Amino acid sequence: MTRFNFHIFANAALGKGLSGGDRIFIEFAKRLSIHQKVIVYVWQEGYEMCRRQGLSECVNFKILNVNFWCKFGFLICYIARIFKSIWFAIITKIDNSEKTIIYSASEFWMDSLPAFILKLRFPQVRWVAGWFQTAPNPFTGFTEGVRERQYRLSAFFYWFVQLPIKPLIRRWADFVLVNNELEKKQFNKLDKLGRVLVILGAVNIEDISQYLRKNKDLPKIYDVVFQGRFHPQKGVIELIDIWKFVTSRLPNAKLAMIGDGPLMDLVKKKIDDLRLQKNIKLFGYVFDGPKKYGIFSESKLVVHPAFFDSGGMAAQEAMAFGLPCIGFDLSSYKSYFPSGIVKVAVGDLQGFANIIAELLENKNKRDRIGREAQKMINENWSWDKRVEQLTTILKT
């Protein structure tokens, strides 16, 4: 077995919730550390995230100390992480060998710049760059279709962050990890060399299967469940509007929302404004395990109303429980959701609500699509398969 030394830079990780990139580096590190040496570079909040996800026992950590700077607010803390990570890359010594793998877990500067610097200092090492979503056009905002609010300012900052990093990755990275076929077009030269790998994401199939064996036929308490970050791209505000349409047809319909994020206060206000307090339950962020699995098991459908997205692991975790998914017809979903989902024209909130109501009223159709969803996940969405993809390409 070829042995590698992995250096994973994940200084952008923060908060209780997990982004897709966070989930990928954590699950990779867990499995890689069984046979490989793994060092994860994070700051204190990222370390706490890893610890909550059960990663702390199996890898080595290098923790950036930015506690002093974080007293001055998010922006100063953010900048401090960038400069501290750069300085760390300047002074750190690693083995200058092709068996040394530097993995930048995101395109954010505190992950990509130290990886770039180490690649310059130690040219024999191999840089694997994570690029799991290309920022939207700042003039279009977070949408691929009709949307009342596009969150253009947030989109601009996201675009600006990626602007200097993409050329560095194109020129210096040895491999790029993306999570759908469309993203490969961002790195055509590397793709022609076979160095762009599509990592579709995965779910913890083994844990879910074990839970389902022990907890069969739980009562359906919730009609629909949503899981995801309360972020502009995820459509959480519009989901409340959708649910208002649903309850006009099914007055007692219940929606469970798992997640947290910058739009939480707006979500709560929208629920109050539309008087949906009895129809929507907010759980906040729920960690992996029996509580979250119970919510999925007690639900009939999962919705993923993102207006701009490159994947959808959060919804696919629920699909592993046999829940059919409903989402907007985004371009990335052609490869990410080949089955088990009903797609709606982007921005058609009434149409989205109609599909929810139709599936809730048609158990046979709901169960059929749910079986397709579960089959797709069980056959193709194992983390062990994703790690095998990575190690196979590294051996080339």
Stretch-by-stretch model annotation:
Residues 341-350, 358-363:
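Conserved acidic donor-binding segment of nucleotide-sugar-dependent glycosyltransferases
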Residues 20-23, 27, 226-245, 262-268:
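A conserved mid-protein helix/loop that constitutes part of the nucleotide-sugar donor-binding site
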Residues 324-327:
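Short hydrophobic beta-strand element within catalytic cores of glycosyltransferases
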Residues 182, 202:
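Carbohydrate-associated surface elements
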